[in-house]
Amino acid sequence: MAEHNKFKDVCISAVLAAIYVLILVASTDLGSALIFFMIYLFMLFVSTRNIIYLFLGAGGLSGASVIAYHLFSHVQERFIAWRDPWSVIDNAGYQVAQSLFAMGTGLYEGSPKYIPVVTEDFIFSAIAEEFGGLFAMLLILVCFSCFIAFLKIAMEQANMFNKLVCVGLGVGYAVQVFLTIGGALKMIPSTGVTLPLVSSGGSSILSTLFVFAIMQGLAIVGTKVKRNVTRRIPTEGLVNEQRQTERIRQLERTGEIGKVGKKKKKKIK
């Protein structure tokens, strides 16, 4: 019965998540749809600890990608621009080609101003061009460190709801970073997603600040829980030691310990 109810809850949550994702797909915001789908998938895995859901999600994502390719013309354009930007450099591939030119030149020699929407979804190309590849790699390490910190905070949570919130926010942040940097490096098709706390945009920066604020609050909660646990363990040990010491003293007062010692000596003789 418990397994049946658990599977029923998974189905209900899957339907609600699918409705939300389909609304984003209908508004042609496929980048956000992918982010929220990955958030739901990993939260489902953490809550159920069933790896089958990850494989089912990967299969569903592959099927949805094929369907989106045939339904939306802009998805086809971005796929062609990702596969061979030089063949469509005058149209859909212009942004990707200019991004590669900027990063390939580097250190003030490129021209990031020629990249369309360079301050948003292709901000990583401008950073790599202006500050060099080393600075770009350091930026990636900073983003990766933030994700690891999110996972560490999630592991410190005793409450499952708090843990799921940490996992969801951490996965959303990581996927957003991967989509932005991966699109600029031509690893994946461009999705139009901004780089958290780096790209321009008031709503993007504000939402990311809310994410970090929530994570900071959950980190404080996790630290308090950890301190309470570490304090409780030695206290229990001290109480047991005190009780044993008091019991020994009582036996010494009544002479029980001495009698036991004398009996043992007689047996030895």
Residue ranges and their predicted role:
Residues 181-188, 193-269:
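A juxtamembrane structural motif centered on a specific transmembrane helix
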Residues 24, 65, 69, 142, ...:
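Alpha-helical transmembrane segments of multi-pass membrane proteins
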